[in-house]
Amino acid sequence: MALWGGRFSQAADTRFKQFNDSLRFDYRLAEQDIVGSIGWSKALVSVGILTAEEQAKLEVALLALKAEVEADPEQILRSDAEDIHSWVEGKLIERVGDLGKKLHTGRSRNDQVATDLKLWCKQQGNLLLDSIHGLQTKLVATARQYQTTVLPGYTHLQRAQPVTFSHWALAYVEMLDRDYSRLQDALKRLNTSPLGSGALAGTAYAIDRQVLALDLGFDRATRNSLDSVSDRDHVIELMSSAALSMIHLSRFAEDLIFYASGEAGFIELSDKVTSGSSLMPQKKNPDALELIRGKTGRVAGALNGMLMTLKALPLAYNKDMQEDKEGLFDALDTWHDCLDMAQLVLEDLKVNEPVTKAAAMGGYSNATELADYLVAKGIPFREAHHIVGEAVVYAITQQKPLEDLSVAEFKQFNAVIADDVYPILSLESTLAKRQALGGVCAEQIAFALQQAEQHLSTRHK
């Protein structure tokens, strides 16, 4: 039976009921709805609606229902209840009779669902923090494993300057650290309780909402009932955090897809995260990474959909807000799955170090070193840049790397070039010169690893 039927003389059309009902997705809020109901029952004791004995009886029944839901959440979907609130109330009345009908006194589904959703977001957010931390930890371990492995660095997908595989992995640790911080900030902002805001104007009972908020694990109660029941900023913030983090994961996936390609051959992905072709027996496809990349659009699309749903909604609650859950649930589930899959990809990843080193030495990636050499000889950088560009063109025509040109050949471009140029052009010199904070010299890589390991080991959620 619907919770609102008294006003109506006709039953809802079955097509409308199917269109309107939300149990098929908001059943995921069952545990939070029960927890919120227990908190509300305690508040009703404080204003004389329930006796302590009645509250205790309700709490026992609700806790038993919660245990059943935890064991078999799918049971909820076998009901024809309109939503999770109706289902919980119906089950409660089955167990305790008319006493269960007193629980909703002073409460609206508007503040109830807002509370349920925030409780769910807090729970899921903490799980996501753990997953981000786990991936960061795996990236740092990978960086430690390949601390001295040279890798070509790219701009415009063209070889630019040599870096290390460690430096590459630590770049994603930095991105994920921002993701972690953003998610933490979002969780701090949403940690306010709307329960007791009623439908829109506040409850008519003198409930201490601050005590109620603390009892439910929130930092404080919300301050404005109109805003409380219509606020979905936390949904947008969590979906935005998910979308931006998925962009980072997509970049991670794309890098590794390229590195694993036959054209690069830098890494070998484990059989555990790849698949084959039904036609071509030689294929080893990076499906895990491609799915991470593909699912990024799904999460970004969910965010855009939610932004449009909330656009121009008048205060306070509107049924449009029922659309907040499916996109949020899917976005956070997808984000969580992709974080875990990225970690799995790294578990047995192998780097082909001879290939990465040879690639790092190719593509005239030491051209900037030659320009810096000329600057040290007193030539302005812009002029040095032009000279080196001409030297590179010449080396390409001769099918030689810069370091194989003779001094005589170098002097065609500028007379100051001498034998002391060759140590400057070596791969080792190129890496060693990047000594500023955040650079790729051995000392900076070691420092960055130590800092990352310390940061992750001492982090608190």
Curated annotation (Swiss-Prot):
* GO cellular component assignments: cytosol
Q: Where are the transmembrane segments?
A: none
As recorded in UniProt, its EC number(s) are 4.3.2.1
In the UniProt record, the gene name given for this protein reads argH
What family does the entry list? Belongs to the lyase 1 family. Argininosuccinate lyase subfamily.
Q: Pathway involvement?
A: Amino-acid biosynthesis; L-arginine biosynthesis; L-arginine from L-ornithine and carbamoyl phosphate: step 3/3
The GO biological-process annotations, alphabetized, read as:
arginine biosynthetic process via ornithine; L-arginine biosynthetic process
Reactions this protein catalyses: 2-(N(omega)-L-arginino)succinate = fumarate + L-arginine
Upper lineage is:
Bacteria, Pseudomonadati, Pseudomonadota, Gammaproteobacteria, Aeromonadales
Protein known as: Argininosuccinate lyase
Concerning NCBIfam families, the annotation shows: argH (TIGR00838), PRK12308.1 (NF008964)
Question: What Pfam families does UniProt report for this protein, alphabetically?
Answer: ASL_C2, Lyase_1
The EC class name is: lyase
Kindly give the HAMAP family that the UniProt entry links to this protein. Answer: Arg_succ_lyase
